[in-house]
Amino acid sequence: LNLKNQKLNKVERVQYITGILHDTCRALGKELVVRPFASIEEDYELMTQAYEQISGEMLIMDKWTQFDWSLTLPVNAFFRKIKRNPLLVETDIFGEYFGLGILPIMLREHIQRNFAYCENFDPAGYVSRIDRAGYHAFGDVNEINYRIMEACLEGHDIDLAIDAFFA
């Protein structure tokens, strides 16, 4: 990549490239949603700083578990680095990387715990992954995870949602 000014610092490089994408999207009447894809705190900070400098309205979307999808990884502590921009929380509620939604699994505690944590950051919304490579959980037992997430989002009783699903 040949930049006009090769002396840009890390924040300025992210800002320069993302700014081009942001301006292009705006010119086309579209909205840019950015993903930090950072596993090192310093990188996350510099990326969110660059995004903030471009536009405080640009949506930052990131996973609710830190680094990647896993039932054993911690919640995303980097959310606290997002100061100005709205947050879209990305969730995996069908086991995209641990069973493709094929293995029967109920993620009640995982969904409830991560949802409660994310609500501390007043997210603009949630994006839930519900399939992988054509596999999805609609119409089988794993649809329960969609119903649990739906109950969380709507402030309904999770136990009642589970009971209704299995009734």
What are these regions (language model features)?
Residues 1-8:
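Active-site groove signature of glycoside hydrolases
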Residues 8-167:
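Substrate-binding groove of N-acetylhexosamine-processing glycoside hydrolases
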